[in-house]
Swiss-Prot record:
Modification note: N- and O-glycosylated.
Statement: the UniProt record of this protein carries the keyword Transmembrane: no
Membrane association type: Lipid-anchor; GPI-anchor
Keywords: Cell membrane, Disulfide bond, Glycoprotein, GPI-anchor, Lipoprotein, Membrane, Secreted, Signal
Record's subcellular location: Cell membrane; Secreted
Disulfide-bond pairs as recorded: 26-49, 29-36, 42-62, 68-86, 87-92
SUPFAM superfamilies: Snake toxin-like
Identification of the protein by name: CD59B glycoprotein
Signal peptide stretch: 1-23
InterPro entries registered for this protein in UniProt: CD59, LY6_UPA_recep-like, Snake_toxin-like_sf
Tissues expressing this chain: Widely expressed in the kidneys, brain, lungs, spleen and testis Testis-specific.
Subunit structure: Interacts with T-cell surface antigen CD2.
Pfam families cross-referenced by the UniProt entry: CD59
């Protein structure tokens, strides 16, 4: 019975940590007139944010990192001569210039939370089994 409760607790913790780990937020605008302020939470299969420019057309949206190459993006968006970047942290696709990973407290605290969560899960596994 004790092992069963431990397993249930472990599964609940995994669900919480896994759901927060894949919740990437990206700007989501097609050719914004001014700075894009609309953001969305990406689905788990879309693991990066795309910022692409073709002439005056701007694309900001969730994207699959493995599909982040110019030829694929041009064919998918049906445009030519595109400049694009993909990134993998929240709201990183504001513009082409700002696609460097931030070194701030928010990013650091997310990594610390993930490390703490992993440590807690290991402790629970050792305690219950």
């Amino acid at each position: 019975m004790r092992a069963q409760r431990g397993l249930i607790l472990l599964l609940l913790l995994l669900a919480v940590f896994c759901s927060t780990a894949v919740s990437l937020k990206c700007y989501n605008c097609l050719d914004p007139v001014s700075s894009c302020k609309i953001n969305t939470t990406c689905s788990p299969n879309l693991d990066s944010c795309l910022y692409a420019v073709a002439g005056r057309q701007v694309y900001q949206q969730c994207w699959k990192l493995s599909d982040c190459n110019s030829n694929y993006i041009m064919s998918r968006l049906d445009v030519a001569g595109i400049q694009s970047k993909c990134c993998q942290w929240d709201l990183c696709n504001k513009n082409l210039d700002g696609l460097e990973e931030p070194n701030n407290a928010e990013t650091s605290s997310l990594r610390k939370t993930a490390l703490l969560g992993t440590s807690v899960l290991v402790a629970i596994l050792k305690f219950c089994f």
